[in-house]
Each structure stands twice: as structure tokens, then as C-alpha cells.
A protein has these predicted regions:
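The feature captures the beta-strand-to-loop junction immediately N-terminal to the Walker
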Residues: 68-70
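Helix-to-loop junction immediately C-terminal to a conserved catalytic motif
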Residues: 83
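ABC ATPase NBD Q-loop/coupling interface
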Residues: 92-106
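Q-loop/switch helix immediately C-terminal to the Walker
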Residues: 122-139, 149
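Conserved ABC ATPase "signature" region
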Residues: 145-166
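ABC ATPase C-loop
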Residues: 188-189
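Conserved catalytic motifs of ABC-family nucleotide-binding domains
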Residues: 192
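Catalytic Walker B motif of ABC-type/P-loop ATPase nucleotide-binding domains
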Residues: 196-200
Length: 248
């Protein structure tokens, strides 16, 4: 079986990705109304130093966009500004015409943010980590609805066959690095945000796991999500999965 976020390597070394099949055979018509516009004229650090300036971004649904640059170029800072975690001194970020800072309630639940940090509870299983997160997010849903939602996300991310394994610590390796990253993505994905901001999802992963994680994000974009990813030194195969690359 060709599972979600997986890769088949051909004899010549090139890859066939799950997202390729989604792109070829996905007949769903994307009707998502989504407009993301960022105008960042200037952002200063607390020291007063200018960190970001003259950035203009206008994107819609169904895109996987990378953010690349040298160490210290401000990639994560830009991601945080776009996600609304930092406020530009001059400029605005708007989703469907609503300012994400002054009209927060109008865009509530639209944004998802996945940091580099591992947020899993090592004593819990794969299923339990996502289940308890869902309980916190959906106090209005009954038990059956939560269980169905959790299993749907695990299946979509190819983690259903690992659901009863304890995740352990990052060094314990009870589940692979790629599976840990997918489960961290699931913690945000279960809320069904339309826009995802992901900070260095391939950090510390093998080349195969890195490809599988980006392939998963590509698959999500093909289903209508707008995804911004800070990426560091991607391979040529990973680079080609992005619809656009912002170089800093």
C-alpha cells in the first residue's frame, strides 16, 4: 500500500510521491475562499535593529510556499509575523480582508502554527496525544465525535497503524522522527485551520523522512490549504515540491 506521506524510489534515484497521485487523481473542486495579503514595511527587534522590511505577499488557497535564507536572515521572524505572533511596526497582515491583529475574532481558528519544538507527551500513545489535544480544542463535541475526528486525522497522516504505541522521548525512538513530526502536525491539523505556518519541519530528520514530511504538507496544500514552511537546505526533490520559494 502507498500510504500518506510516503515515497517510492525508482531505480534512477528519482522519487514518486504520494502527493503526485493526489494531484493526478484528486477530482475535488476546491471552493475555498481564501485571501492572504501581507504588507510588511518594517519590523524592528527590541534592540531597535531592523529585522524585516519591504515584504509583500499575496496568496490564495492550495499553495505550498517555502521560506529560505541564510542563518540569521529572519526566516522564523517572518513566519511569526505572518502568523500573527509578532506585530510589524509598519504594515498589515490580512486574511479575507480582515486584519489579523485588530480583527482577531473574525479570523479565529483560521491559522495553525507548528513550531520546531516537540510538543508530544512521551508517556502517552500516539492516539492519546491527539485525543487529549482534541478534548481541549472541542469542548462542544461528544466523545464519539472526538474519537471519529482523531481517527480521521491519524488515518490521513498515515499514523493509524501506530496509534497504540507510546511516543517516548525524542531520543527514545519508539516512533520514527518522521512519525513524531507528523503527529506534531496532527496536533494543529485536527482544528482544521485553512492556513498553516510550519517552522523547519525537516530539522533533525533523515533525507527520506524529510521528503515524506514535505510530501505530506504538499498533499494538504493540494486539498486547499495555504501552507508557509521555513525550510533549510532542501534537497532538489524537496525543492521541487514547493509552488513558490521566498528567498531572504
Amino acid at each position: 500500500l502507498f500510504s500518506h506521506g510516503s515515497t517510492i524510489k525508482t531505480p534512477d534515484g528519482s522519487g514518486i510521491y504520494y502527493s503526485d497521485l493526489i494531484a493526478d487523481y484528486n477530482e475535488e473542486i476546491q471552493t475555498t475562499k481564501l485571501s492572504f495579503i501581507a504588507q510588511i514595511d518594517e519590523y524592528r527587534f527590541k534592540s531597535g535593529t531592523i529585522g524585516i522590511r519591504d515584504i509583500k505577499i499575496a496568496e490564495g488557497p492550495g499553495k505550498l510556499i517555502g521560506i529560505m535564507g541564510a542563518s540569521g536572515a529572519g526566516k522564523t521572524t517572518l513566519l511569526n509575523i505572518l502568523a500573527g505572533l509578532e506585530t510589524p511596526g509598519k504594515g498589515k497582515i490580512k486574511i479575507n480582508g480582515f486584519d489579523i491583529h485588530t480583527e482577531k475574532r473574525k479570523v479565529e481558528g483560521v491559522i495553525g502554527y507548528i513550531s520546531q519544538d516537540d510538543l508530544l507527551i512521551e508517556e502517552l500513545t500516539v492516539y492519546q496525544n491527539l485525543y487529549y489535544n482534541a478534548k481541549l480544542c472541542f469542548a462542544n463535541l461528544n466523545e464519539t465525535e472526538i474519537e471519529l475526528r482523531v481517527m480521521k486525522v491519524l488515518e490521513d497522516l498515515g499514523l493509524d497503524h501506530r496509534k497504540d504505541l507510546k511516543v517516548g522521548s525524542v531520543l527514545d525512538k519508539r516512533i520514527s522522527g518522521g512519525q513524531r513530526k507528523r503527529l506534531n502536525i496532527a496536533l494543529e491539523l485536527i482544528r482544521q485551520p485553512a492556513i498553516l505556518f510550519v517552522d523547519e519541519p525537516t530539522s533533525g530528520l533523515s533525507s527520506r523522512d524529510s521528503e515524506n514530511v514535505i510530501d505530506l504538507l504538499k498533499e494538504l496544500s493540494l486539498k486547499g490549504k495555504l501552507i508557509f514552511v521555513v525550510i533549510h537546505q532542501p534537497s532538489s526533490d524537496i525543492y521541487k515540491m514547493f509552488d513558490k520559494m521566498l528567498i531572504m
